[in-house]
């Protein structure tokens, strides 16, 4: 198939989103083999090419129409959109959906000895960051002036190195901040991974493939968020038991052989079934309670 007819999806070459992005696509039935020495991986069973690139290149590739889709952190997407708007370059794309991985937050942090009250405490100080546009937007909204120190990595060492008074960096657990004598003060942006599409018109066949991939992604994400619940229940407490099942659709109720006083309940729950809920179910006479993961869902 000509390259122009193949769907091009950009993903992070290496880093926190790379493995999860490839896992997601494989869960959607896209088969491919990655050669670490090559930036392009061709799907074995679908007209799809994966471009493995730097994460901060992905938004621009999608916005310029070089690739058709991309999986990227919302923080990187927003940073690039602000920069492109400033430079009067193409800055639009279609955000298809958030994904269930890559959660992090962009936060301000200061040295442990810093007497921090609120963001105004940073007035006139130097802040190191890899996200100058998101930081600038936040500080402008607060009416705070500051000096920025642009770094591409190792932002957390800037205060100790005498490069800045504070930092604005991505935080997942806070362990890196603690190891560098810093503490988090303000969250300025919450982020997850998301999947985006070029806003340029697509040929019908390619758009149909995009829609198919998105439908499968929706099914994979729904399955991760859901559990399949099976249990036996007395008919006299059936309504109470069904009411306890968290986020469940209308369950399937089936008779049990040789037991007219009990039924089998099959249900899909979109919320966690906690131990205390299971104990309540048991008190109502439920037995043989099974809670199982779901691999795929559709419809």
Curated annotation (Swiss-Prot):
Cellular component GO terms, alphabetical: cytoplasm
One Pfam family from the record: HisG_C
InterPro entries: ATP-PRT_HisG_long, ATP_PRibTrfase_cat, ATP_PRibTrfase_CS, ATP_PRibTrfase_HisG, HisG_C, N-reg_PII-like_a/b, N-reg_PII/ATP_PRibTrfase_C
Keyword Cell inner membrane: no
SUPFAM superfamilies (alphabetical): GlnB-like, Periplasmic binding protein-like II
Cofactor requirements of the protein: Mg(2+)
Acetylation as UniProt keyword: no
This protein's UniProt keywords: Amino-acid biosynthesis, ATP-binding, Cytoplasm, Glycosyltransferase, Histidine biosynthesis, Magnesium, Metal-binding, Nucleotide-binding, Transferase
Principal subcellular localization: cytoplasm
EC number: 2.4.2.17
Pathway it works in: Amino-acid biosynthesis; L-histidine biosynthesis; L-histidine from 5-phospho-alpha-D-ribose 1-diphosphate: step 1/9
Compartments, record wording: Cytoplasm
Residue spans crossing the bilayer: none
Catalytic reaction list: 1-(5-phospho-beta-D-ribosyl)-ATP + diphosphate = 5-phospho-alpha-D-ribose 1-diphosphate + ATP
GO molecular function, one term: ATP binding
Stated regulation of activity: Feedback inhibited by histidine.
GO biological process: L-histidine biosynthetic process
Superkingdom assignment: Bacteria
Function: Catalyzes the condensation of ATP and 5-phosphoribose 1-diphosphate to form N'-(5'-phosphoribosyl)-ATP (PR-ATP). Has a crucial role in the pathway because the rate of histidine biosynthesis seems to be controlled primarily by regulation of HisG enzymatic activity.
Similarity section: Belongs to the ATP phosphoribosyltransferase family. Long subfamily.
Name of this protein: ATP phosphoribosyltransferase
Species this chain originates from: Shewanella sediminis (strain HAW-EB3)
